[in-house]
Amino acid sequence: MASSSSNRQFSHRNANTFLTYPKCPENPEIACQMIWELVVRWIPKYILCAREAHKDGSLHLHALLQTEKPVRISDSRFFDINGFHPNIQSAKSVNRVRDYILKEPLAVFERGTFIPRKSPFLGKSDSEVKEKKPSKDEIMRDIISHATSKAEYLSMIQKELPFDWSTKLQYFEYSANKLFPEIQEEFTNPHPPSSPDLLCNESINDWLQPNIFQSSDERSRKQSLYIVGPTRTGKSTWARSLGVHNYWQNNVDWSSYNEDAIYNIVDDIPFKFCPCWKQLVGCQRDFIVNPKYGKKKKVQKKSKPTIILANSDEDWMKEMTPGQLEYFEANCIIYIMSPGEKWYSPPVLPPTEEV
């Protein structure tokens, strides 16, 4: 019956899919038609369903599915039929999977035309001998169609195209990231919310509402926030508690930039070591950056505010030219902390009992 396992982190991508429905007495013909309808968008070419009996007498169902385009799903329950949940695998050798399904079936149904595997990287069986050597395009097309993960994709390329793999690895890694993007986990904020103990909370609240908490027209530009003050006053914890963000400390590393972040944080980085400071402070969109050890890329598809945190001894404004300072003040709310201010409220102590 349907499994209760979580859908998180599940991913399947392949043009050849092998399904096993345990303890499933479903009619193979009915199951074939239901699975066929589920994958219409990927252009199904062939499906084989067979009912088989276990030694204990229980029935289970096997299915081999072949599509023109790779089936790409992230829902582990996608192939559930009539409450029965299958084990979903990539059929790396369709010939062997088909032979396995047809070994001892009680009932069989198939639709479409079976496509024998002609993969150059699995070796050649007697029925797959080809005099003509496959081209690089054919090899890559086959790898793209049958790889099920980033690691498998790169491993196949290394095996079949070793010279290209050794000289163009960064390009293959780039295509692997596009084919198999990482599944984003649901954001859980590790930083507890805090209430600033400031002389002028209103100015911070006035900045928070339109720039962090409220969605705005994509054409409008946000405004950044600059906070300068003593260390150990809770600036970083407060800034990081507001939501999903890009966080940089010591240096700005664009290689892990998250487009889904609501805002950026530049924490304790001297002004002279902050590249693209104008783009960050000005909440600009679609600008080019050059990640270390990576290729140039365009980031920030929409206007995104930046919170800049600095200690008094590295005040950015002291390092700026008059022209830079004018730009900074026009695009940034500036908050200079007063003595005694903190970005968290002091704990409320219980009243002491009189002795």
Curated annotation (Swiss-Prot):
Residues 175-187 are annotated as: Oligomerization. It comes from the Viruses. A divalent metal cation binds at E52, H60, H62, E104. The keyword Transferase applies. Divalent metal cations, possibly Mg(2+) or Mn(2+). A motif (RCR-1) lies at residues 18-21. Residues 11-114 form the CRESS-DNA virus Rep endonuclease domain. GO terms for biological process: DNA replication. SUPFAM superfamilies: Origin of replication-binding domain, RBD-like, P-loop containing nucleoside triphosphate hydrolases. It comes from Maize streak virus genotype A (isolate South Africa) (MSV). A motif (RCR-2) lies at residues 60-62. This is Replication-associated protein. A motif (Nuclear localization signal) lies at residues 292-303.
